[in-house]
């Protein structure tokens, strides 16, 4: 899909809540023109030039850690090149290991590195709220029964994508996006065309301009073909023409009879096309040009 789009001069990008080191290698190998990571806090192009970055202020990180410790909440921190945990237990492992495997424990990580995103690890669910002094700077985005992303207020996938759009001198109406989760809501509000995957959050589907098939059904490819951004590859069935019982037409030519097997799904006007070509002079009595 990426190569087909690039061949038409269309730039492609990936916007994710994850950092690059949490993205599967096969996705990295696609070489997207732009990558919006960590819910919009870090944006790079394929040449690894930084387009935009918004680390969480150091004093806000310290204040968050103190609040988490006071509340008995475990936490994690995501930097530019790695992420770490405040501790390790079964609850944390079940939440984070499918996204970032084998993270080290380093509660003092922020003392020597910029932090772009943090996490809570707890069993409080949607009842968890930041205190007012932290809520001025941070917001929680629940993504797991036992964890929320803790992101800088104002950052989002939409912000990161907008920085790419500004960098390219484009406008939001020049952008088409796909999404499936709640952290895509702001992105759907921003982009000119928004497409929800087949099994996506109901709130996201309400905002979508178009709902495609599921990931397993190649929903992205399907939507791009339907919109004409990628040429649809026609799949003609291989048939035993001698024994085929479907519709056929025979055209008399100077070189003998030409028998065509008709596939209504792909070429319902085959005969009309041949007649039209003949009438318009593309048939000189010997061959079609």
Annotated model-derived regions:
Residues 21-25, 129, 160, 186-187, ...:
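Phosphate- and divalent-cation-binding pockets in alpha/beta enzyme and binding domains
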Residues 30-31, 39, 133-137, 190-191, ...:
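Short, structured coil segments at secondary-structure junctions
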Residues 39-42, 144-148, 199-202, 216-220:
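Short, acidic/turn-prone active-site loops that include or flank metal/cofactor-
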Residues 1-92:
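Active-site phosphate-binding/coordination module
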Residues 67, 71-190:
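Conserved acidic, metal-coordinating active-site core of Asp-based
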Residues 16, 161, 171-215:
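Acidic, Mg2+-coordinating phosphoryl-transfer loop and its flanking beta/alpha structural elements
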Residues 232-289:
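Cyclophilin-like peptidyl-prolyl cis-trans isomerases
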Residues 32-40, 54, 95-97, 140-142, ...:
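Short hydrophobic/aromatic-enriched beta-strand-loop microsegments
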